[in-house]
């Protein structure tokens, strides 16, 4: 329960595993999942509970090493300008190597993003002109829909289809037709897929990336859900399926879904292609809005400690 976390404020270093049994009362603790209904005038009927199916927010406490890392930093009473630490980059590289089998990842390939959606738009602004068509699979995460449409991009949907076993699959024939007909040169690929929950198999990603290569389509791969995989499945990073995919793809990650850190804000991109990386970095910096929070940095480092792997 919450009293266990209070021990951290008393100077006692407590190493605990992720707690999936404690029930948190989040009322009055800055949680829209507990206190907000996004439908004007809607109220919870008497005898019913509020179930926030509309937002990806867990009621589990985060891994204790996150709290510990932030508490240690908070005790130093200055929070001025800073640069990302070596430990920040090392934590991400180690996480990607151990969790996803990534090789060759270096600090210069990693860049901070205030959020995955903001990173998606920065990348699209480099890959496209406003008004361009962008390929997405449907059903489509509403965040993509709102972000792309608000920024002047037209979404072309390629619907997923169920195979004979009831598994949602990409329709490669439809994708090719849509790419050609709509002169598409950028696609947003959600892996694992939100909302269907598909963890794509390697051959599926390879086939999609072959299509994108054939028609010179840049790819933004949102892999924010890649840590939450059920047994019997394995996340395959889009950039890992071929050398062309490695250079054609901007990948987006964050600890926010995995460790319930959305309120801290802090995502990151991985871009191997120097031409793409330099332009995305420039685009995301133009407004001076895409700046890291020092506590967010320490939260990521805490999340990516050994306890986080468990």
Where are these regions (language model features)?
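A short helix->loop->beta-strand "cap" motif at the edges of active sites that frequently abuts
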Residues: 153, 214-217, 246-247
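Walker B catalytic acidic pair
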Residues: 223
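Alpha-helical elements of Rossmann-like donor-binding domains used by nucleotide-donor carbohydrate transfer enzymes
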Residues: 65, 69, 91, 174, ...
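PLP-dependent aminotransferase class I/II
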Residues: 248-310
